[in-house]
Design a protein with these regions (language model features):
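C-terminal beta-strand-loop-alpha-helix "lid" module of Rossmann-like NAD(P)-dependent dehydrogenases
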Residues: 1-284
Length: 284
């Protein structure tokens, strides 16, 4: 049985840990709100660009050709795997890694290229023998548009050089702080819907072709940026949930240790009283 001194040390240690997990929960909660706000602010912009592109892709643009719209036989795929830089986020990192490995399962290493965003997917995939062509890190919980642009530029270069035939982004979609879903989204080639109903007509300056040439890469960048924001919110939501659980568990452990400590003290006091009474009786 542990001594009273040992129990006091354990209670102090668990209390210190609880303070740390509580602080981490509060930080994750504040950052989660900011990430959600950014994602919500980005959505209308992305939706509007998508709407214009869908309208234009169904228009008669004589002579317009773009490799970004060119569907070709898929022999090699570029995977952009988005994950976390840090741990202590529950099953967030393991879930996205598991999903990514499922996408690569059974495929020869010469049929895919991998770009990672986040230290966790980079290190985990390297440890499993996956060659990483390019890695980005240091911004998983606070991505910027420039990060998305750099990632998309790397993938686009591979695609335009015909080193890959499609680009797929693997990231975690944020539902709420308790639910995050790993998923894959094809970025290239850009899909052209066949049944889009024509709506409002647009006037383009200087021309529809030049506007489309400018919008296509922007659309890809904003799509990657949205994926980074979704992943950031998912990471922070998972971390907040994990730290909430850790804080609650620490509280329960402190209560249990406190009860054990009080019982030990009560037993010690009872023994001391018994010894005093026994000594007094012996002197009579």
């Amino acid at each position: 049985m542990a001594s009273a001194q040992d129990l006091r040390k354990r209670i102090k240690s668990v209390t210190n840990t609880q303070q740390i997990t509580k602080a981490m929960k509060m930080v994750a909660s504040a950052r989660l709100r900011r990430a959600q706000t950014k994602a919500e602010a980005t959505r209308p912009y992305a939706e509007k660009i998508g709407q214009i592109l869908r309208h234009m892709s169904n228009s008669d643009l004589e002579g317009f050709e773009s490799p970004l719209l060119d569907v070709r036989p898929v022999e090699r795929t570029c995977y952009i795997v988005v994950g976390a830089d840090k741990g202590l986020a529950g099953a967030f990192s393991s879930n996205v890694l598991k999903f990514a490995m499922e996408q690569l399962h059974g495929k020869s290493s010469d049929t895919y290229r991998v770009i990672t965003a986040g230290r966790k997917p980079r290190d985990s995939m390297k440890s499993r023998g996956i060659r990483i062509d390019k890695s980005y890190a240091g911004f998983s919980d606070k991505p910027s548009y420039e990060h998305a642009r750099a990632i998309m530029h790397e993938a686009l270069s591979l695609y335009e050089r015909h080193e890959v035939d499609e680009v797929i982004m693997i990231y975690t979609r944020f539902v709420n702080s308790m639910t995050q879903i790993a998923q894959a989204e094809r970025l290239l080639p850009i899909e052209q819907p066949q049944d889009e109903v024509k709506g409002q007509e647009y006037d383009f300056m200087p021309s529809a072709v030049s506007v489309l040439e400018a919008l296509l890469p922007k659309y890809l960048e904003i799509t990657v940026y949205n994926g980074l924001l979704q992943s950031a919110a998912s990471e922070l939501g998972a971390r907040m949930t994990a730290m909430t659980s850790a804080t609650d568990n620490a509280g329960e452990l402190i209560e249990s240790l406190g009860l054990e400590y009080n019982k030990l003290r009560q037993s010690s006091i009872t023994n001391e009283i018994s010894e005093i009474v026994g000594g007094a009786n012996a002197l009579q």
